[in-house]
């Protein structure tokens, strides 16, 4: 193999690795965003449950807007 062919093969490997990494990162970002949204919804449900109980709402007034 000549130097030019080796250089072309090297560039193809670099390009393939870069494209694969870029698409993998985007897929992971989407999965992380979905997990974060799910966690936020679960936390909101827990806070609403706490705010519905007077004892818990009294302890965590900053979460329940100061209401009992």
From Swiss-Prot:
<keyword id="KW-0629">Postsynaptic neurotoxin</keyword>
<comment type="similarity">
    <text>Belongs to the conotoxin A superfamily.</text>
</comment>
<keyword id="KW-0027">Amidation</keyword>
<feature type="signal peptide">
    <location>
        <begin position="1"/>
        <end position="21"/>
    </location>
</feature>
<dbReference type="GO" id="GO:0099106">
    <property type="term" value="F:ion channel regulator activity"/>
</dbReference>
<feature type="region of interest" description="Lacks the Ser-Xaa-Pro motif that is crucial for potent interaction with nAChR">
    <location>
        <begin position="52"/>
        <end position="54"/>
    </location>
</feature>
<keyword id="KW-0800">Toxin</keyword>
<keyword id="KW-0528">Neurotoxin</keyword>
<dbReference type="GO" id="GO:0030550">
    <property type="term" value="F:acetylcholine receptor inhibitor activity"/>
</dbReference>
<feature type="propeptide">
    <location>
        <begin position="22"/>
        <end position="48"/>
    </location>
</feature>
<dbReference type="GO" id="GO:0035792">
    <property type="term" value="C:host cell postsynaptic membrane"/>
</dbReference>
<dbReference type="GO" id="GO:0005576">
    <property type="term" value="C:extracellular region"/>
</dbReference>
<keyword id="KW-0872">Ion channel impairing toxin</keyword>
<comment type="function">
    <text>Alpha-conotoxins act on postsynaptic membranes, they bind to the nicotinic acetylcholine receptors (nAChR) and thus inhibit them. Has a distinct nAChR binding mode from other alpha-conotoxins, due to a different three residue motif (Ala-Xaa-Ala instead of the conserved Ser-Xaa-Pro motif).</text>
</comment>
<dbReference type="InterPro" id="IPR009958">
    <property type="entry name" value="Conotoxin_a-typ"/>
</dbReference>
<feature type="modified residue" description="Glycine amide">
    <location>
        <position position="65"/>
    </location>
</feature>
<keyword id="KW-0964">Secreted</keyword>
<feature type="disulfide bond">
    <location>
        <begin position="50"/>
        <end position="56"/>
    </location>
</feature>
<protein>
    <recommendedName>
        <fullName>Alpha-conotoxin-like Lt1.2</fullName>
    </recommendedName>
</protein>
<dbReference type="GO" id="GO:0090729">
    <property type="term" value="F:toxin activity"/>
</dbReference>
<keyword id="KW-1015">Disulfide bond</keyword>
<keyword id="KW-0732">Signal</keyword>
<dbReference type="Pfam" id="PF07365">
    <property type="entry name" value="Toxin_8"/>
</dbReference>
<feature type="disulfide bond">
    <location>
        <begin position="51"/>
        <end position="64"/>
    </location>
</feature>
<keyword id="KW-0008">Acetylcholine receptor inhibiting toxin</keyword>
